[in-house]
Amino acid sequence: MSIHPQLNKNGELQHLLTTEGLPVTILRHILDTAESFTGVTERDVKKIPLLRGKSVFNLFFEPSTRTRTTFEIAAKRLSADVINLSMAVSSQTKGETLLDTVNNLSAMHADMFVVRHNQSGAAHLIARHVGPEIHVINAGDGWHAHPTQALLDMFTIRRYKQDFHTLRVAIIGDILHSRVARSQIHALTTLGVPEIRVIAPKTLLPARVERLGVHVYHNMTQGLKDVDVLMMLRLQHERMESAHLPSTEEYFKYYGLTPGKLLLARSDAIVMHPGPMNRGVEIDSEVADGSQSVILPQVGFGIAVRMAVMSILAGN
């Protein structure tokens, strides 16, 4: 278990805050449960009653398209009542604290909070202060974590590669500002991936990133050699407080994934991206739309994975 406990006294998942320290049994249970939900999308009636009568509040303090939409779809397919709050026009803009906002919503008999916030630790703070009947899902907090994105990435890898124990995985791009990268590394390690590489210029890597058990490369030619899975990341300009790169054109020249660079990886390698993509910056359109790209299926799997997380938290 991590330093931010996510489990109740019975060892069951109470909140999903981070992939760090998440037991492998629970991680696999989420992936297996998600597998059972993939068929729901293909039905004429795309609903099952596992969360009927439950209220799910989406609290997004940062802009989001894929994450907020897939959480909403997932909750509705489980028959939950979904309340989407525009935090940009909420009482927070009038000076109300985060915990006061949550306490007021809890008084409205919320069952689950899905929280995205620009401050690291926001979801953990909420989880520590809500009652035991309420569950909190971290939908991304600052630079810290984005556990459901990492879980849907693991689901995607398992769908296409089956066995984690034989894989060589490369995460390429802005590792420094990426909560996704941190969550991916923890999940990949827990699932037994023997070699995780990070490829980025020195200015886009966290200090002492090697302590996470990854191999560091500053060169795509060496870093992509014989890789099975390529996980691309965008440049997070909104989190950059100073100049980390000379230009996006130069970044694309050295770190953008082109058809030529993709040839360095294994011939059956898959290309992933959590979105939003910046074509011509971290990835060439020919690769993004090519036969080795699994970027669109990756988005679709997010619904089943988020259904699984909410269902398990609700005790199903």
From Swiss-Prot:
Which chain positions lie within coiled-coil regions? none
Reaction catalysed by this enzyme = carbamoyl phosphate + L-aspartate = N-carbamoyl-L-aspartate + phosphate + H(+)
Matching entries from Pfam families are given as: OTCace (PF00185), OTCace_N (PF02729)
* Residues holding carbamoyl phosphate: 66-67, 116, 146, 149, 275-276
SUPFAM superfamilies on file:
Aspartate/ornithine carbamoyltransferase (SSF53671)
Among the entry's GO cellular component annotations, what is one?
A: cytosol
Stored Gene3D superfamilies: Aspartate/ornithine carbamoyltransferase
- Tell me, how does this one assemble? Heterododecamer (2C3:3R2) of six catalytic PyrB chains organized as two trimers (C3), and six regulatory PyrI chains organized as three dimers (R2).
UniProt protein name: Aspartate carbamoyltransferase catalytic subunit
